[in-house]
Amino acid sequence: MTEKIEGSKFLDSMILGSLLGDGSIEMPTGYAVNPRISFTQATWEKDYIDYKHDLCNELYKTNNVREAHNNTYRFGISSKEKILTESMIAKTRYENNTRKLPKIDEINPVVILFWYLDDGSLTITETKRKNRKNSLSRKLKISLQSYKDDDILKFISDFKKKYDIEFKPQYETIKGNKKIVSICLNNNLKEIIKFMDLIYPYKNLIPECMHYKFCICYKKTLQMKSDDYSKYNNCDIINTGICTCRKKDFSHLL
């Protein structure tokens, strides 16, 4: 049974997951003397950042959500919350302030949930197959562009041991160097379902504007025959063939 994470542990796990995603630790500038934790989301994710703000405000001194540049909203936790900030710096930063991934003992389903909601995606596309009916392909991806390759590979190994979910590194060539930019579960529905099993218990706590990230467009196949996985649909694809989350019509494939 998955551990139930709640209270202050849920909040601190949300903050850690956000720092792996769209959150940041701002170093002091001007008259400021202490770093602080801040959160940023797109304007259409306003309910989501309000939710994060309300959680943080229950335990930490937090400023109001405000409009920022490039169609975003943001807020920060007071720099006076030194114990929290120092703890998060220790978990997510090297001494030179470059990013590091937390130890696997610090990773739990709530950390994974907010990391995925911030920096993850689940794309569903039509795959053409020769002499056979086309099918749905799924790719779950979490961006990791600011981390060392060795740290990412170690994280993949540790995550596999802890949760029996095997991410694959995805590389891109950047300025002539091959670099890991994300980890993914590519066209492996069983692994994607195991990932969803981890985070789904918390879905109803999350604003509806983010529920599309839980939608796997599941329908029974010869290999996957259970009806249970249809709970991971945030659309009525089983009856209509249409994924309203992605505004795509897959009826000709089903």
Where are these regions (language model features)?
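Internal intein/HINT superfamily modules and their associated LAGLIDADG
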Residues: 1-254
